[in-house]
């Protein structure tokens, strides 16, 4: 029998992680039908991640800052975590050939292997990241950083947001995105402007179950650099919400390193839930994950592909 794994991030009303919930605090609905949880874990689960960094022309002034922020993510990876580093502009490259836990190797790639400036083939890059993760076990994550909108390769077949969102949902790949938008008129001095949002969940029974919520707000800021792009692509919070990841939009480069570290912390604080589906009909099923408790919000993937046996 197949177990459908669902990883959930639970936040309190104060925006902090809620780490100590028990199995009976969660409810998972498959196409609206409540499922019995056959898997529950609230200990740290290892991750396999493809980190994709925008090397487009608009990012040139910030290349070194992004590199340092990505190195911060590597520094807080745990021994069982594995990663590959990708960059996208004139081409999309991902190194090394195999996933590794070797921090020194990942630092070397960040310091010497990233390409020079070019366009921003955003959805193509995510598609390459999904392909890299296909045969990996456990929790599969893409972390992408960009300051701009998708700018596909001219004269070539390119992926759309719809293409990669569908594929990420079918292949159970969680997408986290960090967008840099220093030109935001609502910035008010820096820090996060907003995170992506999700639909609200209703109550259930005594005490209520909090449903999907928005993405965390965060770090204070100030300063920043002149605008380098109109704004990050509006598809980023959509694919993050659909896959159970997170979207963080920054208004200053000051918060880059802290945000990369924040993503790593969140990934290490997720709950692992699982259930055995009633039928494997080869169709996409809607998922809804809720947690009991006042003011709690849950982020988890919103669908899964009920692949038939064989």
Predicted regions and their residues:
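Scaffold/interface architecture of coatomer-like assemblies
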Residues: 1-310
């Amino acid at each position: 029998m197949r177990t459908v794994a669902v990883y959930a991030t639970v936040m309190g009303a104060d925006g902090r992680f809620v780490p100590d919930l028990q199995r009976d605090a969660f409810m998972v609905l498959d196409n609206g039908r409540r499922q019995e949880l056959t898997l529950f874990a609230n200990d740290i689960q290892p991750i396999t991640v493809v980190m994709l960094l925008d090397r487009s022309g608009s990012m040139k002034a910030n290349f070194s800052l992004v590199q340092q922020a990505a190195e911060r993510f590597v520094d807080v990876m745990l021994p069982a975590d594995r990663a590959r580093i990708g960059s996208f502009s004139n081409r999309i490259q991902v190194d090394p050939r195999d996933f590794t836990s070797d921090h020194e190797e990942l630092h070397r790639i960040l310091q010497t292997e990233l390409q020079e400036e070019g366009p921003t083939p955003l959805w193509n890059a995510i598609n390459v990241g999904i392909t890299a993760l296909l045969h990996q076990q456990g929790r599969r994550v893409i972390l992408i950083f960009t300051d701009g909108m998708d700018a596909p390769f001219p004269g070539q077949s390119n992926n759309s947001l719809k293409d990669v969102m569908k594929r990420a949902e079918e292949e159970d790949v969680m997408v986290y995105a960090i967008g840099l938008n220093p030109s935001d008129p609502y910035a008010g001095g820096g820090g996060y402007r907003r995170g992506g949002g999700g639909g609200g969940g209703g109550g259930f029974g005594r005490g209520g179950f909090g449903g999907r919520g928005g993405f965390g707000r965060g770090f204070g800021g100030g300063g920043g650099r002149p605008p380098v792009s109109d704004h990050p692509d509006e598809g980023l919070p959509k694919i993050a919400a659909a896959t159970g990841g997170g979207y963080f939009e920054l208004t200053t480069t000051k918060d880059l390193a802290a945000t990369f570290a924040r993503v790593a912390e969140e990934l290490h604080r997720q709950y692992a839930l699982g259930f055995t589906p009633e039928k494997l009909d080869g169709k996409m099923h809607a998922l809804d994950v809720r947690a009991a408790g006042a003011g709690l919000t849950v982020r988890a993937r919103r669908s899964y592909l009920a692949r038939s046996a064989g």
